[in-house]
Amino acid sequence: MGTVLSLSPASSAKGRRPGGLPEEKKKAPPAGDEALGGYGAPPVGKGGKGESRLKRPSVLISALTWKRLVAASAKKKKGSKKVTPKPASTGPDPLVQQRNRENLLRKGRDPPDGGGTAKPLAVPVPTVPAAAATCEPPSGGSAAAQPPGSGGGKPPPPPPPAPQVAPPVPGGSPRRVIVQASTGELLRCLGDFVCRRCYRLKELSPGELVGWFRGVDRSLLLQGWQDQAFITPANLVFVYLLCRESLRGDELASAAELQAAFLTCLYLAYSYMGNEISYPLKPFLVEPDKERFWQRCLRLIQRLSPQMLRLNADPHFFTQVFQDLKNEGEAAASGGGPPSGGAPAASSAARDSCAAGTKHWTMNLDR
């Protein structure tokens, strides 16, 4: 690099003073500046140009110095970052403990320097189970022919006894009972039973008894005392229980007495099994004296209240009474029917069965 100095007449003219005298010669630079090649003191121009030329190198030098400082600080930071060791655990190292145990075992096995024999280590001997000792001997051997106790090994243990199954106790398991009957069939069975019980009434027929029953039920429906018919299989079983326990054939000498006793049973059945709270007395009363009617009701209540309550609470007892009612019709069919009026009874039973429809009532209970 070098400095080029150009001279022109204008510059020389400008450099002259007004008096025509030339400007003073510039002072020579010092020896140090010459050694630097003339860069030590740059020429001073108009308007302070020399000062700006002096400032530019200083800016460059400061930038280079800043870069060097930044690089040096970065190196120091990298050098200061060291891996921190893990804190030592409070307990001993398991690997060290294992090595120590191995060394102790080796020292115990090796004989000491002064001589002597090391004691053998105790080794557990496996025990053979009894089942494994009774395996088959090899072919050609005579171990199988040895009797027990001759040194051939212990005999195999006897097999455990088989559990004995107790024989079924008769009557212990419940017996399934299936009873199926329709409303018309049960009405006919009830009529047959009353006709056989009242043997003194020769002109009585099952249809007449069924007519009394249907007349009371129809009257209560027409008067508005009940919304649905009372004649159902369950209610017929209840009426049969009352008639069986209250009607006495030797005490009933006329059809009027039988009708009064039968309507008393119906009144109690309606009171116990009916859907209404109370029923009128007029459809059930056929005699002028009401006292006799109430006396019969009280006697039946005192005698049969436990059985009536049991019939509603115990399904097995109900099934038994239901089966007894059905057997009454079978007994009448096998015995030839009532003593008199067999043909009218059969025709009335057929009409009742047709009126009741083909629906059957089935019970399936275990007893």
UniProtKB/Swiss-Prot annotation:
Keywords: Cell membrane, Lipid-binding, Lipoprotein, Membrane, Myristate, Phosphoprotein. One of its GO terms (biological process) is layer formation in cerebral cortex. A lipid is attached at residue 2 (N-myristoyl glycine). Residues 1-11 have a biased composition (Polar residues). Its main location: membrane. Myristoylated. The Gly-2-Ala mutant is absent of the cell periphery, suggesting that a proper myristoylation signal is essential for the proper distribution of CDK5R2 (p39). InterPro entries: CDK5_activator (IPR004944), Cyclin-like_sf (IPR036915). Brain and neuron specific. Residues 74-84 have a biased composition (Basic residues). GO terms for cellular component: cyclin-dependent protein kinase holoenzyme complex; cytoplasm; growth cone; membrane; neuron projection; plasma membrane; presynapse; protein kinase 5 complex. Residues 154-171 have a biased composition (Pro residues). Heterodimer of a catalytic subunit and a regulatory subunit. Activator of CDK5/TPKII. Belongs to the cyclin-dependent kinase 5 activator family. This is Cyclin-dependent kinase 5 activator 2. It comes from Homo sapiens (Human). The gene is CDK5R2.
